């Protein structure tokens, strides 16, 4: 036995056993560190010491503790129920939590009350309900901070609408140049520019705003650019195929002139009809108050067909002296003029709605929408002016009614600002986005192709094709730049 006690291995095992027993004793461990023993009550006392006074907390001090933990920040009066019980996975307000524990303004929360309140705090933290509530509140605060002031909204809105409305007065300035080649090519560029801006504005800004998300998030801009790329790819491919097929057909029929020599060309036929228009032979195309002063005869059937193929500018140029030298009674003005004026006024009202709602969101949202509408209104107002003249109005009347319909944009601006300031503007953005897509693709795209037909008949296909591409890509680039860098450019 003595030998066993003196054995080194036994002594080592005994020493390790005694050391283990000493380490597992809390008092021994605490005394080894020179620190007092930690108890469960110590944590409660620490909270009361940091947030309260003495040995208790007031209701406001407990609320400060909850705010620090992001608990009790709900809107209050929660009425959600799940199978007859209140949904506890909801962010409650501090008032709701205090009511559940029968706390009043005069209550003092001591250790026992705080210990009973701790499971409530733990449940709210575990449900993470208040985390999403805080994120939503922060996003709302950031949105409110980013919104322009009322002065900026009305000031920039009125300025943009005024510039757009002045486009209606530009129609008279271009009448002398309507027969020039550069006028039709300039008009072609502006139509293509309008298509690019309207389509891109709806794609990059109006549609995402209608659905309520930021277009700069989740690669939306790059994906929308691919959507525009698909549209542009098919447009480019179709035009190239038409150019190649036209050249092939011309080469194939290059020696078949015997049939066409016996018939006058379409250009010669149109020039003959224009000469008759100037001489007053086609009196049914001229207003009654003018045809009574001119000698006329009934046109042939072929001449009616040719007249139908003439552009509005051709007819207007032949009748300009009759329209401009004499006043026109309202009863002599065609119904088409009043239909154009009313429809244009409604169109401008919706444009104003889109501009007003856009400026309530941000200044750059309003500017980008205004740029798209301006690019669309410039060729649109020029075309309306010519149609009003051709329908029987004098220059003064056409300018007045064209400007009057343009002023409907002011009324739409006021409604858009009021609706965007007090209600959700998403519905207005959805309406404007659909309208922009329709105008660009269903209305202006065929008009762009129609303007190109005369150049295509003359054989100059490449120049109109280049102008179309420049207009489309310019409009697309403007909208992309305004969308990508709207938050980095400061105004004022």
From Swiss-Prot:
It comes from the Eukaryota. Pfam families: Zip (PF02535). GO terms for biological process: cellular response to glucose stimulus; cellular response to insulin stimulus; chondrocyte differentiation; gluconeogenesis; import across plasma membrane; inorganic cation transmembrane transport; insulin receptor signaling pathway; intracellular monoatomic cation homeostasis. One of its GO terms (cellular component) is apical plasma membrane. GO terms for molecular function: cadmium ion transmembrane transporter activity; ferrous iron transmembrane transporter activity; iron ion transmembrane transporter activity; manganese ion transmembrane transporter activity; monoatomic anion:monoatomic cation symporter activity; monoatomic cation:bicarbonate symporter activity; zinc ion transmembrane transporter activity. It is linked to Hypermanganesemia with dystonia 2: A metabolic autosomal recessive disorder characterized by increased blood manganese levels, neurodegeneration, and rapidly progressive parkinsonism and dystonia. Affected individuals present with loss of developmental milestones, progressive dystonia and bulbar dysfunction in infancy or early childhood. Towards the end of the first decade, they manifest severe generalized pharmacoresistant dystonia, spasticity, limb contractures and scoliosis, and loss of independent ambulation. Cognition may be impaired, but is better preserved than motor function. The gene is SLC39A14. It catalyses: Zn(2+)(out) + 2 hydrogencarbonate(out) = Zn(2+)(in) + 2 hydrogencarbonate(in); Mn(2+)(out) + 2 hydrogencarbonate(out) = Mn(2+)(in) + 2 hydrogencarbonate(in); Fe(2+)(out) + 2 hydrogencarbonate(out) = Fe(2+)(in) + 2 hydrogencarbonate(in); Cd(2+)(out) + 2 hydrogencarbonate(out) = Cd(2+)(in) + 2 hydrogencarbonate(in). A motif (HHHGHXHX-motif) lies at residues 251-258. Residues 179-186, 246-397, 446-460 are cytoplasmic. Residues 1-30 form the signal peptide. Homotrimer. Electroneutral transporter of the plasma membrane mediating the cellular uptake of the divalent metal cations zinc, manganese and iron that are important for tissue homeostasis, metabolism, development and immunity. Functions as an energy-dependent symporter, transporting through the membranes an electroneutral complex composed of a divalent metal cation and two bicarbonate anions. Beside these endogenous cellular substrates, can also import cadmium a non-essential metal which is cytotoxic and carcinogenic. Residues 31-157, 208-224, 419-424, 482-492 are extracellular. A motif (XEXPHE-motif) lies at residues 376-381. The keyword Cell membrane applies. Disulfide bonds: none annotated. This is Metal cation symporter ZIP14. Induction: Up-regulated by iron (at protein level). Down-regulation upon iron depletion occurs through proteasomal degradation of the intracellular pool. Up-regulated by tunicamycin, a drug inducing endoplasmic reticulum stress (at protein level). Up-regulated by lipopolysaccharide/LPS. InterPro entries: ZIP, ZIP_Transporter. The chain crosses the membrane at residues 158-178, 187-207, 225-245, 398-418, 425-445, 461-481. Ubiquitously expressed, with higher expression in liver, pancreas, fetal liver, thyroid gland, left and right ventricle, right atrium and fetal heart. Weakly expressed in spleen, thymus, and peripheral blood leukocytes. Expressed in liver and in brain by large neurons in the globus pallidus, the insular cortex and the dentate nucleus and to a lower extent in the putamen and the caudate nucleus (at protein level). Expressed in osteoblasts and giant osteoclast-like cells, but not in osteocytes found osteoblastoma and giant cell tumors (at protein level). Glycans are attached at residues 77, 87, 102. Belongs to the ZIP transporter (TC 2.A.5) family. It is found in: Cell membrane; Apical cell membrane; Basolateral cell membrane; Early endosome membrane. It is a multi-pass membrane protein. Keywords: Cell membrane, Disease variant, Dystonia, Endosome, Glycoprotein, Ion transport, Lysosome, Membrane, Neurodegeneration, Parkinsonism, Signal, Transmembrane, Transmembrane helix, Transport, Ubl conjugation, Zinc, Zinc transport.
